[in-house]
C-alpha cells in the first residue's frame, strides 16, 4: 500500500514527474492528490521522494525470504516461542502459510495461526496439521449482525471452528467494540460457543484508535469516530460473564 505523509511533503514535484499513470497532483495551488484508482502501484514515486513523504506499507516475501527472517531469530524463541501468522486473514494466503508452517515444524519451531476461520476448509485442515495453537477471532455470534458488520455470513466460520477446535488447541480472540458486539447477549452467546467447543480461554481485545492515522495516510476517512472506547468497568463486566461460565478471560492485544 502507498502511504502519503503530508507533514513531510515539500511539494517538490518529483513524484508527479515520474508517475507513468499521471495519478499524482502535487501543485502548491491545490491539495496534494493521489488518484488511487489510476495508480498501478509501480512505486516509482516512492523512489523519487527525497523526504519520505511517500512510503510503501508492507513488504512482499517469498517463502525462502521469510524463512531466513524466521531462522535468524530462532535463538530468541526458547522452549515456548515460535511464529505467529495473522493478518488480515492468513487463510487468504493459505498455500503460503502451509509452506511456512511445514518448514517451521521441520525445524522444531512452534506455530500459531491467528485466524477468523473464514477460508477454504480443505486448505485449513492441511494447515492445522502443522499448527500448535489457533487464536480464533470471533467477531459476532448473531449471523445477521455478523454479516452487517463484516460483510460475510458466519456460517463458514462456525463450520471451520468445529474443525479447528477438534484438531488443535484453541483460544478465542474477541475484538470488542461498543455498539457492535459488546452487549451482554453476544457475550453470553460467545461464552456458550466457547464451552460447547471445549475452548478454555478468551482473549478480550478492546477497540483502540492507534490505527486511525493509517487511514489518513491512505487518503481514507477513519471509521473510529463512530465507536467509543469501552471503560474499564464495562470490560470487567464482560470478563465476569466469561468467568461465570468457567472460562479464563483476560485482556489481550488492543485491536
Language-model features and meaning:
Residues 185-197, 214, 233-255:
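C-terminal accessory regions of radical SAM enzymes
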Residues 224-234:
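Short, flexible active-site recognition loops that position polar ligands and cofactors
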Residues 216-225:
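Short glycine/proline- and charge-enriched loop/turn segments
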Residues 22, 52, 106-107, 245:
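Conserved dinucleotide-binding and phosphotransfer motif residues
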Residues 1-14, 32-41:
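N-terminal pre-triad scaffold of radical SAM enzymes
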Residues 64-217:
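Conserved AdoMet/S-adenosylmethionine-binding subsite of the radical SAM
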Residues 57, 205-207, 252-254:
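Conserved beta-strand termini and adjacent loop/short-helix elements that scaffold enzyme active sites
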Residues 14-34, 44-60:
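Iron-sulfur cluster-binding cysteine motifs and their immediate structural context
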Amino acid at each position: 500500500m502507498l502511504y502519503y505523509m503530508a507533514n513531510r511533503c515539500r511539494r517538490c514535484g518529483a513524484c508527479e514527474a515520474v508517475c507513468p499513470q499521471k495519478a499524482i497532483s502535487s501543485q502548491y495551488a491545490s491539495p496534494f492528490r493521489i488518484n488511487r484508482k489510476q495508480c498501478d502501484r509501480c512505486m516509482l514515486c516512492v523512489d523519487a521522494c527525497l523526504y519520505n513523504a511517500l512510503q510503501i506499507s508492507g513488504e512482499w516475501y517469498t517463502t525462502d525470504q521469510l524463512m531466513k527472517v524466521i531462522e535468524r531469530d530462532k535463538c530468541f524463541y526458547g522452549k515456548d516461542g515460535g511464529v505467529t501468522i495473522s493478518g488480515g486473514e492468513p487463510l487468504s494466503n493459505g498455500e503460503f502459510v502451509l509452506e511456512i508452517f511445514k518448514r517451521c515444524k521441520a525445524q522444531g519451531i512452534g506455530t500459531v495461526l491467528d485466524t477468523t476461520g473464514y477460508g477454504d476448509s480443505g486448505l485449513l485442515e492441511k494447515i492445522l496439521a502443522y499448527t500448535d495453537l489457533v487464536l480464533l477471532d470471533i467477531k459476532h455470534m448473531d449471523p445477521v449482525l455478523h454479516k452487517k458488520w463484516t460483510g460475510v455470513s458466519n456460517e463458514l466460520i462456525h463450520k471451520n471452528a468445529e474443525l479447528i477446535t477438534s484438531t488443535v488447541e484453541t483460544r478465542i480472540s474477541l475484538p470488542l467494540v461498543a455498539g457492535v458486539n459488546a452487549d451482554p447477549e453476544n457475550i453470553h452467546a460467545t461464552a456458550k460457543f466457547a464451552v460447547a467447543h471445549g475452548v478454555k480461554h478468551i482473549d478480550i481485545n478492546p477497540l483502540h484508535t492507534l490505527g486511525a492515522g493509517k487511514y489518513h495516510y491512505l487518503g481514507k476517512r477513519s471509521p473510529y469516530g463512530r465507536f467509543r472506547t469501552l471503560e474499564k468497568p464495562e470490560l470487567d463486566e464482560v470478563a465476569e460473564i466469561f468467568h461465570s461460565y468457567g472460562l479464563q478471560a483476560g485482556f489481550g492485544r488492543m485491536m
